[in-house]
Amino acid sequence: MEQPHAAAAAAGGGEGEGGASPDTGLEGPMWRMGLGGGGGGGGGGGGGDGDAAGRLPERPGEEDCVYYLRTGACGFGDRCRYNHPRDRGGTEFGGGARNAAALDYPERAGQPICEYYMKTGTCKFGTNCKYHHPKQDGAVLPVMLNNSGFPIRLGEKECSYYMKTGQCKFGTTCKFHHPEFGGVPMTPGIYPPLQSPSIASPHPYASLANWQMGRPPVVPGSYIPGSYTPMMLSSGMIPLQGWSPYPASVNPVVSGGAQQNVQAGPVYGMGHHGSSSTIAYGGPYVPYASSTGQSSNNQQEHGFPERPGQPDCQYYMRTGDCKFGATCKYHHPRELSAPKSGYMVNSLCLPLRPGAQPCAYYAQNGYCRYGVACKYDHPMGTLGYSPSALPLSDMPIAPYPIGFSIATLAPSSPSPDLRPEYISTKDQSVNQVTSPVAASEPVGSILPKGVFPADTMMRAQTNTTSGGSSSPGGGR
């Protein structure tokens, strides 16, 4: 009967023909389902790979069947037009018997060179690759690596991911070029190193005993008194006069013979100690004298390229620095790289550039997030008042919004029952207090008892919208 025979063939039993008889007509479907050639069934046939290879055609002049090399089976059977070698162990996919490194890649002198093999040293097609795989003294051509361990391939396109992040997930197998950054630090250096006489100091570690460490002397009186934790400041800190959120300002007076020359350095930077007289800071503006030679050296180290046809480097336009250095593909104007020496900074340590355009962000918010690197002007005239003119307790506080027509008070009646009159007008000349109260008194003192500024504004706005002043003695 055919049904028991087919069931026995599907179960793996049978006569060593891979579990399927040619009489049943199920050989092709069973091979497509992966049931053929089951490694030796219960009937002792044990066909395995040998029987499967015996039924599959061998075509020496054709390419090897990749599916057969990987799985040991072929769904097309004897109708497959590729080669099915009996010894699968001698190929790349032969059950892991030989890895890719031990493969002998074919040398085809008349064919083009395998680019993937020349860049990575391996070939994923193995012996089936139709390109030429040259060898140099029996070894693969070496690939140069940069300091980060990524391949340097001159003449190839730069790896965009590496140029943005400094890393490459493909490692040495990446086919693109990974240039050196030329020692440019990944983070821009805003703070220049402290320039002070190098003094050799003893160090507890023997390997660090020969280090030359710059140690600026501590200036007496450079502590901040007050309720905060005492904090020692270096003698190079800029002593700014004027308004400060701290309870007391830094004492700029140097006592004794330890008087040092204090020059203004970059923002929060350390000053340079010299032998000239001490600079006297007067007024809210502080001269910003940066080191010209040091800035020029930094520009020479970075070597920012000028590419007139390319867009401007936005990071360089904002900060004056570029972490990519000479490898940056954008334009870096020379005028921004010129050292800006001798310009002034205001009491907020923001640059004053009289000929430049005012900083719109500073005019709206009162500060600038770019600091001294901002290329725009930060005048103190944009503020409504000088922060250092009056203490906070004596500053006048306006209870009305800007542009609001303040309703003036009529002469108050001696009777406490009568409500005060309010006269609203658009003429600024008449908008003045008609009460005999002095004009220098605060706003709260000219209001009658029981009347608050919020109530005053509400009633004044109501009278303004009604189209005229209230009648004498009238209320609400």
UniProtKB/Swiss-Prot annotation:
It is found in: Nucleus. Its main location: nucleus. A zinc finger (C3H1-type) spans 59-87, 108-136, 153-181, 307-335, 353-381. PROSITE patterns: ZF_C3H1. It comes from the Eukaryota. InterPro entries: Plant_ZF_CCCH, Znf_CCCH, Znf_CCCH_sf. One of its GO terms (molecular function) is mRNA binding. Residues 1-10 have a biased composition (Low complexity). Residues 34-51 have a biased composition (Gly residues). Residues 290-301 have a biased composition (Polar residues). Keywords: DNA-binding, Metal-binding, Nucleus, Repeat, Zinc, Zinc-finger. One of its GO terms (cellular component) is nucleus. Residues 1-57, 290-309, 456-476 are annotated as: Disordered. PANTHER family: PROTEIN PHOSPHATASE RELATED, ZINC FINGER CCCH DOMAIN-CONTAINING PROTEIN 6. This is Zinc finger CCCH domain-containing protein 6. It comes from Oryza sativa subsp. japonica (Rice).
